[in-house]
Amino acid sequence: ADIEATVMAYNASHFDGAEPKGFKDFFDTDKFPGARSAWKYASSGILEAALLADGVKPEELYPLDVERALKKLDTIKEDIIWWETGSQSEQLLSSGEVSMALVWVSRGLSSADKGVKIDWTNWTSQTGFWIVPKGAKNKELAMKAINFFTEPVQQAEFTKYMPYGPSNKHAIDKVDGKYKGNLPTDHLDTRTLLNSEWWAENQARVDLRFQEWLLQ
């Protein structure tokens, strides 16, 4: 019912001059020193971010070249502090323990008052769906609930508590002003949509390879 995002966020206190832009800078610890952080989960978008930083065009990402992505990750492996919960990612950034992190946009925005900024040069997103299972006993009520959840007023209100982008375009003008210009729906032109079909077919294999790489 909304458009989620994994974005590059950074603690501005780490940068006196130029500030980082895009995944390429996330992987450039010479130009932008400091620890990095990302979700310890293969299908979080970290492999896509690595490939984009390595020069792969968004439209040419799939099928993912996993080994190339891991080779790119090797360049910053010693600098990465992996997060496993959203609150952990927010703490790492806001405390300044890491200079940059790939985080859920809601966590980045929650830390804005602590000097955390979001860069929209590159970001990734996954597709989510509301579904009613075949044979559901309360199909009509379920459909009414989905209709309610996706109405403009409800979507705009939900953004106050979870600042993702409303999927109903009629909700955009109703969003709280403090988030306008900094939601996924304001930056769809720079989004890379993860290929859910490819991941469904390959996740078990890639998860195993990613865990092997982490232990190396």
Positions of predicted regions on the chain:
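A bilobed periplasmic-binding-protein/Venus flytrap-type ligand-binding module shared by bacterial periplasmic
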Residues: V7-H14, L51-G55, T127-K139, I146, ...
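Structured segments of extracytoplasmic/periplasmic soluble domains
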Residues: T29, I76-D79, L92, G96, ...
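Short, hydrophobic alpha-helical packing/hinge segments within bilobed ligand-binding/sensory domains
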Residues: S89-L92, G108, A142, Q155
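A ligand-binding cleft/hinge motif common to bilobed small-molecule-binding domains
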Residues: S94-S95, M100-V116
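C-terminal capping/gating helix-and-loop segments adjacent to ligand/active sites or protein-protein/ligand interfaces
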Residues: A156-Q216
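Periplasmic-binding protein-like
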Residues: T29-S43, V66-T75, A112-A136, F149-I172
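Extracytoplasmic ligand-binding site segments that recognize negatively charged/polar headgroups
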Residues: A1-S94
